[in-house]
């Protein structure tokens, strides 16, 4: 829809750096939301708005969705005139009056399945705490999503989290669709270390504490891992934890943490071979793993002759500097952030001869 002169003026005003002394002007102009000013800025050719309810900033379409969810008709009109796609609002429109307004502003009566999936994944694109919490609030238990087959969206989520799903078996068809979505948002929060979002899910869903622990292991988030295991006392079998840590390659911090906590490093070595993870394999050797014959047999069985050849060498030794007990995540991160395996270097030198 074509913007009015009034909405264009408001758009220019929202893009200015306005001092606190002049906030009353913004309030008089309707640029006020949740007891704070609405600010606007452009990032990578996309319009973002910021207010007290979204201190980190959100994309304009997502701001529209929140305004629709709150039945805030003035902001629905304003954001639409600023360029928001009113069809995004239809996802959140739960009252007849608001749905009618969205249609008046150009929304389709019926959104195709593919378009709803597009809206879903476009909305999750910005990995901030504000946005992930909002996605959870908008999409979980949303009757408008019944338009699509939940199996479609479930399948997309399962694909995005496929590595995690293969080892945890916690996101299966016995879960309600709402639970699947919650686990999805929670996993994103842990993967991107979104502390406010992590805190939100942790307090709201005590039954998913183990899920958070699994995500911390899988995504190599040693800070979250330490907080859960040592401070919050969330527990799993330590070898099971190590198994999850070894599934993604170069997960040095999570592997080291589990090793220090008593996990079997030879079992970790075998899991790394099972998953074709050369980086993890040599890191386990650096930590003292020595299941060479068993590992070689496993590699040959899986047809991975590069790893089998690597395990045939007799020149590997534990790295003494790694064997000191360090549990502070800051120190672990500093120690391993740019770590290069000494034993992998030995193997690569041998290969180049």
UniProtKB/Swiss-Prot annotation:
Organism superkingdom: Viruses
A Pfam family recorded for this sequence: ASFV_360
UniProt key word Hydrolase: no
GO biological process: symbiont-mediated suppression of host cytoplasmic pattern recognition receptor signaling pathway via inhibition of IRF7 activity; symbiont-mediated suppression of host cytoplasmic pattern recognition receptor signaling pathway via inhibition of TBK1 activity; symbiont-mediated suppression of host toll-like receptor signaling pathway; taxis
Keyword Signal listed: no
Record key words, sorted: Host-virus interaction, Inhibition of host innate immune response by virus, Inhibition of host IRF7 by virus, Inhibition of host RLR pathway by virus, Inhibition of host TBK1 by virus, Inhibition of host TLR pathway by virus, Viral immunoevasion
InterPro entries membership: ASFV_MGF360
Similarity annotation: Belongs to the asfivirus MGF 360 family.
Subunit description: Interacts with host TBK1 ad IRF7.
Role according to the record: Plays a role in virus cell tropism, and may be required for efficient virus replication in macrophages. In addition, inhibits the phosphorylation of host TBK1 and IRF7 and thereby negatively regulates the host cGAS signaling pathway and antagonizes IFN-mediated antiviral activity.
Name used for this protein in its record: Protein MGF 360-11L
Organism field: African swine fever virus (isolate Tick/South Africa/Pretoriuskop Pr4/1996) (ASFV)
Lineage of the organism: Viruses, Varidnaviria, Bamfordvirae, Nucleocytoviricota, Pokkesviricetes
